[in-house]
């Protein structure tokens, strides 16, 4: 076998050895086998001494070329193996952030007002109403004029309403959704509108400058007052999980005719308490048949269509459902109080 054949055989064996080397230790063993002090290429160096001087240059060049090939392959293969080992080591040391910490973090919960608000909206959605919202900052037109409030109505006065400028207010009710939606949607319309409201009132156990309200309104052909009272009875039955006694009293609201106040029997069962002011009843909603003027302002013919609207305070419902006597507790951020409902 010539020296060239020996070198070719060495290259083939080397390629096989390198392909089987999957770690730095394996590669080191291959390097020692071929390039070590007692390695294969050391043997070729010993053979070179036996060649005539005129052949040494040619044979030596062939040996060096093969040796250089081995060194280059070992270098490239070494880089790949090292990168693989570093990646594996990184994965071993990686912190599993999905594991729980040494202490469990306390989870929050829905505020009682948010909880009641969601419950109310869910009931109306089950009744076929669509949820719509409107801005807290509203034009006087949408908050009052389109809802049949006269220019000199007391609700428009500074002592009852927060004015941002002469024509812009913080909405006093979520009825601004009604004026907006009736202007852009033609009957049939069934909408429930949740949100915050603002009124310039004294803060007490029963009233606050900021409160939450849900308005629901329906406009279609042949809507009657009995549809309204049936809706109210069905809603309170589901909300409280029992049949409740309701009382309807005639009342005046500019945007409905006739208008009613809706009272619910107090949990004191007529015995009298601070919540109901010893009356045995609690006012929970205002409602009525949508005034023809409101329909006309929305370009809806009151001779063809009719509708009802109702608005209820969420704080009042929460107070009734959970036996809370002071509306101020909802905004005082007392965790001892709030955690009872989370």
From Swiss-Prot:
Mg(2+) binds at residue 257. It is found in: Cytoplasm. One of its GO terms (cellular component) is cytoplasm. InterPro entries: aa-tRNA-synth_II (IPR006195), aa-tRNA-synth_II/BPL/LPL (IPR045864), Phe-tRNA-synth_IIc_asu (IPR004529), Phe-tRNA_ligase_II_N (IPR004188), Phe_tRNA_ligase_alpha1_bac (IPR022911), Phenylalanyl-tRNA_Synthase (IPR002319), tRNA-bd_arm (IPR010978). One of its GO terms (molecular function) is magnesium ion binding. The keyword Ligase applies. Its EC number is 6.1.1.20. It is an enzyme of class 6 (ligase). Keywords: Aminoacyl-tRNA synthetase, ATP-binding, Cytoplasm, Ligase, Magnesium, Metal-binding, Nucleotide-binding, Protein biosynthesis. It comes from the Bacteria. SUPFAM superfamilies: Class II aaRS and biotin synthetases, tRNA-binding arm. PROSITE patterns: AA_TRNA_LIGASE_II. Binds 2 magnesium ions per tetramer. One of its GO terms (biological process) is phenylalanyl-tRNA aminoacylation. NCBIfam families: pheS. HAMAP family: Phe_tRNA_synth_alpha1 (MF_00281). Tetramer of two alpha and two beta subunits. Belongs to the class-II aminoacyl-tRNA synthetase family. Phe-tRNA synthetase alpha subunit type 1 subfamily. This is Phenylalanine--tRNA ligase alpha subunit. It comes from Chlamydia trachomatis serovar D (strain ATCC VR-885 / DSM 19411 / UW-3/Cx).
């Amino acid at each position: 076998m010539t020296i060239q054949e020996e070198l070719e055989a060495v290259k083939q064996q080397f390629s096989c050895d390198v392909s089987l080397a999957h770690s730095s230790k394996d590669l080191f063993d291959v390097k020692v086998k071929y390039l070590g002090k007692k390695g294969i290429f050391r043997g070729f160096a010993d053979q070179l001494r036996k060649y005539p001087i005129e052949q040494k240059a040619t044979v030596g060049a062939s040996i060096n070329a093969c040796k250089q090939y081995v060194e280059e392959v070992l270098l490239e293969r070494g880089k790949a193996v090292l990168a693989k080992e570093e990646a594996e080591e990184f994965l071993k040391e990686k912190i599993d952030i999905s594991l729980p910490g040494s202490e469990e973090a306390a989870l929050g919960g829905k505020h009682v007002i948010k909880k009641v608000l969601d419950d109310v909206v869910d009931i109306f959605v089950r009744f076929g109403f669509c949820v719509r919202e409107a801005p807290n900052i509203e034009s006087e037109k949408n908050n009052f004029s389109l809802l049949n409030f006269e220019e000199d109505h007391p609700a428009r006065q500074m002592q009852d309403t927060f004015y941002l400028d002469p024509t812009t207010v913080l909405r006093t009710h979520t009825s601004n959704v009604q004026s907006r939606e009736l202007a852009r949607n033609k009957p049939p319309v069934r909408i429930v509108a949740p949100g915050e409201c603002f009124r310039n009132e004294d803060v007490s156990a029963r009233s606050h400058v900021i409160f939450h309200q849900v308005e629901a309104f329906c406009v279609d052909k042949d809507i009657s007052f009995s549809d309204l009272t049936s809706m109210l009875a069905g809603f309170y039955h589901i909300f409280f999980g029992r049949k409740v006694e309701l009382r309807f009293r005639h009342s005046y609201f500019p945007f409905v005719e006739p208008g009613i106040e809706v009272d619910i029997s107090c949990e004191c069962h007529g015995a009298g308490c601070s919540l109901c002011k010893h009356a045995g009843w609690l006012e929970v909603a205002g409602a009525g048949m949508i005034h023809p003027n409101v329909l006309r302002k929305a370009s809806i013919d009151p001779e063809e269509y009719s509708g009802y609207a109702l608005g209820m305070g969420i704080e009042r419902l929460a107070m009734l459902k959970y036996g809370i006597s002071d509306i101020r507790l909802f905004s005082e951020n007392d965790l001892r109080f709030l955690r009872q409902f989370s």
